[in-house]
């Protein structure tokens, strides 16, 4: 008999952890929640807080060999993925180029700009591709994008580009999977109060204005779960970010970029 599971990447902290916490009290038809991230001890802490039976998969999802292990485990457990939630990712702020830290080569800084592309784009695509055969009618995919996907972001260039990829890929995938009744929701929050900024601001600072729109991970996840339930293709939390989304559709991007650059220079 197949086991119904929820699979969450980036589950050790932040939004991924919050998804595990909020989904745990529901879904009596779910047999296990699978938690995926690199830090085993952090995953164990999350698992200990859940009532559902859990499976900890401590792995680096940018490594193909480790994704093979995930596929093998899905086969061994005869898993049916009812929800795939891709939250693994990170961002780095600051001017692009060899300034601080020194991105002289991929080898010098494996967790730098190229690392964002590998994790935010390649790994998300790869894990989605591998998980699709284990999904069934009514399954859900939730992909963590960002409001940064709506517009190019100076001094956040690579991160914004990776999230634009996630949004575009996920919307297209959702159209492909409609006939199978598998539904994809892209979550596009603005700044969220998580450890994300501890990493992001090691190389630069965000606009002070953005921090005034910061919301809790609880609020973002609650909205995302609701939007996924109603089969919505996008989940945009908070009125300021919803207004920003409309703005990026109505106003030429260059005009908005000029304002962003002006505000950055005045800080």
Show where each model-derived region lies.
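Active-site helix of classical SDR
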Residues: 128, 162
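Residue(s) in the substrate-gating loop at a strand-loop-helix junction
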Residues: 146
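The beta1-alpha1 cofactor-binding region of Rossmann-like NAD(H)/NADP(H)-dependent oxidoreductases
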Residues: 59-69
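Conserved glycine-rich Rossmann-like NAD(P)H-binding loop of the short-chain dehydrogenase/reductase
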Residues: 27-45
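C-terminal helical subdomain
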Residues: 112, 186, 207-243
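Conserved mid-core segment of classical short-chain dehydrogenase/reductases
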Residues: 89-114, 155
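Conserved glycine-rich cofactor-binding loop
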Residues: 12-13
